[in-house]
């Protein structure tokens, strides 16, 4: 037993469709966000490589594959061009379409990939909006209570202070 640490993810991302002045500039920002997300994912993988099994570490490889997916990138760029809109809105809309399709398949493995896309979409949107994801900082051994928790958040926790996780 130990104290509960409530991870509050109630703040929502403010994703509003906005007209943009430069499509090329918005596409450049999107591509830069992809590179930053890839670098963050590689960094997390390196931090976790000694803490996780080879099988568990493969989730980061899967995340990198999603972030490098030319179809996802192309559809997002096409969305920006055809709607003359901001990249964070385009990311949200395109990934929402992908996750809806994957969840409709009813396969638990595929649904887990849909969850990965949601997490990566959130990461990209946070990068585009120049915001940071809530980090979990434990000062004493605690039980983490959350609606959901991302692999990125898990990798930032001092494992010696985690008594359990309830989602």
Model segments located where?
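Non-catalytic, soluble scaffold/interaction modules
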Residues: 1-167
């Amino acid at each position: 037993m130990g104290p509960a640490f409530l991870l509050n993810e109630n703040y929502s991302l403010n994703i509003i469709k906005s007209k943009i002045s430069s499509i090329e500039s918005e596409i450049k920002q999107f591509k830069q966000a992809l590179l930053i997300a890839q670098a963050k994912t590689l960094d997390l993988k390196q931090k976790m490589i000694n803490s996780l099994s080879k099988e568990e570490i493969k989730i980061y490889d899967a995340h990198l594959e999603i972030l490098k997916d030319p179809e996802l990138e192309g559809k997002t760029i096409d969305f920006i061009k055809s709607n003359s809109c901001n990249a964070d809105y385009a990311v949200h809309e395109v990934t929402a379409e992908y996750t809806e399709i994957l969840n409709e398949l009813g396969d638990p493995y595929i649904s887990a990939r849909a969850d990965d896309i949601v997490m990566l979409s959130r990461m990209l949107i946070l990068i585009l909006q120049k915001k940071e994801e809530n980090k979990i900082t434990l000062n004493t051994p605690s039980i983490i209570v959350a609606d959901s928790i991302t692999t990125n958040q898990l990798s930032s926790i001092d494992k010696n202070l985690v008594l359990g996780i309830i989602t």
